[in-house]
Amino acid sequence: MNNQADKGRFFPPEWYPQSGIMLTWPHQDTDWLPWLAEVDALYARITREIIPHERVLVVYRDEEHRQHIVNMLQSMDIPSSEILFTQSDSNDTWARDHGPITVYDQQHPVLLDFGFDGWGGKFKAERDNLINKTLHAHGIFPGCTLQSLDIILEGGSIETDGQGTLLTTSRCLLDGIRNPSLQRRDMERILRENFGIDRILWLDHGYLAGDDTDSHIDTLARFCSADTIAYVACKDPADEHYAELLKMEQQLQDFRDYQGNPYHLVPLPMPRPHLDEEGNRLPATYANFLIINDAVLVPTYEDPHNDQEALTRLAGAFPERQIIGVNCSVLIQQHGSLHCISMQLLKDVI
């Protein structure tokens, strides 16, 4: 057994014990405005599913926004005893990418605060980039060290097995826009230093149409355990994703786990195509699930056959956890899904 937690710097997997989930709640000055009532209700539904398992940290914009959220939760009979409210203005709601990443240093929780630039400057992010510092200054993370770094890195771009392995995509981390002065060797050094990892698995293939993130790993392939990876598989040769996802699958088959064995691979179906108002395809993916204490929240997309197949396959990958489907069709209207809007805060953080 590779006891990574006994090392100086430890990057835990998502199934590590959690103290809470961070949600940066949508408001009327975000791009969610056309769908605000629907996305509000979805955030409330997600909150309802999480609080039996752990706390929810709700980041609200101002007092009027907080009161709106409280009133809505009360109207839905959602108890607030496990909800922690904190104020910080925001450009958008993608907590996975602007939220803090929990590591442990000598078993002490450290929150990594990487720079966030709206996925290579595609969108404004100056307020999102201050959220972690604001929350830390508010005392939301008592006893935690906040380590701010100048490097641009999003939480959705990295996965770990908790055994010293980091899984990521070259298309995102080496895009030449986020960190133009960094080569692969530089990025690998930064990842090793800050996450305490031993090895990096680079996926060079795989994308989703409509994805703004340049192939975040959390849209494509996810660790379910130290020896199991769930991934998006495309079975339709006529689909534009077919060739790239086949190459990704072949690369995953070539990877070895931390003990030198092939990974157990769990193929997830692709949902039926979802289109925006202009007819452009939206990045619906079942790989964007969220692991919480004793459960897994899985995005569904009003596609009964594929939704059920994804839930069944993930139930097999997480036999000791409750599998909870959550309709996330509205989230893909802004090109993300369930994992993208949430960030786990591991034990002893809140």
Descriptions of predicted regions:
Residues M1-I350:
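The feature marks the mature, well-folded catalytic cores of soluble enzymes
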